[in-house]
Every structure is written in structure tokens, then in C-alpha cells.
Amino acid sequence: MSFGDIVVQARQRIGLSQKHLASQLRKEDGSPISAQYLHDIEKGRRNPPPPPLLDQLAQALNLPPDYLYYAAGELPQDLREAGLGPEQVHKVFGALRDELKSGHKT
């Protein structure tokens, strides 16, 4: 499932229109994102948004932030700031792969 598909499903699950959700999300300058920008994200025409918008999306959609970061191919800020070395990152992702292969959902 793509990042856009996740956003669409979560948005529809809680009954929000694109316009309403977009009005809740703020760019760095404090202005709301456009419904067109959100539409493009949902359709995969734009890359997933930057971390500050991922956090806002997670809150607005009642999703765990880590789930959206994972779907967007991003590391959450606390992990980026932790200064993990290559071996630690490899170990964490290896554990996740092992968990997925064993059929368990994390």
C-alpha cells in the first residue's frame, strides 16, 4: 500500500474531505496546505510531505506517527537525532525484517 493510499483510507475512515484535512495542515509559514497538494500526495504525484507535516497528518488522521514515517520512508526525528551509526540502523531494520518474515505484525 502506498503512502497516498494510507492517507486516503485514514481520511475516509474518519469522514474528512480533502479540503477539510488540508485546512488542518500547516506549512512552515503557518498557512494551510492546499487541497490540490493533498490530492497530489494521495495520488502519488508528490513525494510524501516533510516530517513536520507527517506529524500533523498523523495527529489529524489518528494514526501513530511512526506508521506514517515508515510509509513515507522517513526516520522519526527522535531516531534521526539519536545519532545511530550504520551498524545500529542495520540491526534495527534487520530486526524489523525478521519480525515481518515471521508473520508477526509490529
Identify the meaning behind each predicted range:
Residues L25, E42, L53, A72:
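DNA major-groove recognition helix of helix-turn-helix
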